[in-house]
Design a protein with these regions (language model features):
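WD40-repeat beta-propeller superdomains and closely related acidic/aromatic-rich repeat-like regions
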Residues: 1-223
């Protein structure tokens, strides 16, 4: 599954050279598969929304549309409120949650079953303010896009910050009563030289990698 600068989303079979499906959808799409391979998501900046599709019905309408409306919280910071540029999309290990990362100072987690945004992740500094040339379709996104990921168990989100730290958010065991709930980073890791613009977690081992000007490997502190 791929998204292109011409606002197209294509479905590929690696055994053939031609795309098996081609969808035209305006809004600088960002795409991601869920772990089952049966559902995919498309994040659209121009609509501030995430569309969920059944892969078996590629050419039909999405079965869920998740709208990211953070006006109430963002209006306390700026007027008029502006949703940061969406730069990242990834599903949790169970497929229940989807992480919508932005270039700004907030990321979002939505429930794919209910279509509601359940968490706002704050405490970091967005990479739209980091040094470096833009790597995305929208220049004001800066170098944002790959600086966040889930842990393999789907219980934590890890993301880089323009200040050089790596932030960790732990998701509560039970969903909040009031949506969306704001989660501040529970842990901040130091040691990465420069801005960590890429963050990845080993799917099998307790081993994390971050990269920017240099590549850093992280292991847990064992008792």
């Amino acid at each position: 599954l791929s998204a292109a600068v011409d606002d197209s989303v294509r479905l590929w079979d690696l055994r053939t050279p031609a795309a098996q499906g081609n969808m035209r959808i305006q809004g600088h799409p960002i795409v991601a598969y869920d772990p089952s391979g049966l559902v995919f998501g498309i994040a659209l900046n121009e609509r501030s929304s995430i569309l969920l599709y059944d892969i078996r019905k590629f050419d039909q309408n999405p079965f869920i549309t998740i709208t990211i409306d953070d006006t109430a919280a963002l209006s306390q910071i700026m007027m008029p409120p502006r949703i940061p540029v969406l730069t990242h999309l990834s599903f949790s290990n169970t497929g229940q949650y989807i992480l919508a990362g932005t270039s700004g100072d907030v990321h979002y987690i939505a429930d794919t079953y209910t279509g509601k945004v359940v968490y706002r992740l704050t405490g970091h500094i967005g990479l739209e303010r980091a040094d470096g040339a833009s790597v995305g379709l929208v220049p004001k996104a800066g170098i944002s896009g790959q600086e966040m990921c889930w842990t393999p168990d789907g219980r934590m989100v890890i993301a880089g910050s323009a200040a050089g730290q790596v932030h960790v958010w732990a998701l509560p065991e039970h969903p909040p009563a009031t949506l969306p709930a704001t989660l501040h980073s529970t842990t901040t890791l130091q040691g990465q030289e420069g801005t960590p613009s890429v963050v990845a977690f080993n799917p099998r081992c307790a081993h994390m990698c971050t990269a920017g000007a240099q590549v850093a490997f992280w292991l847990p502190d064992l008792p």
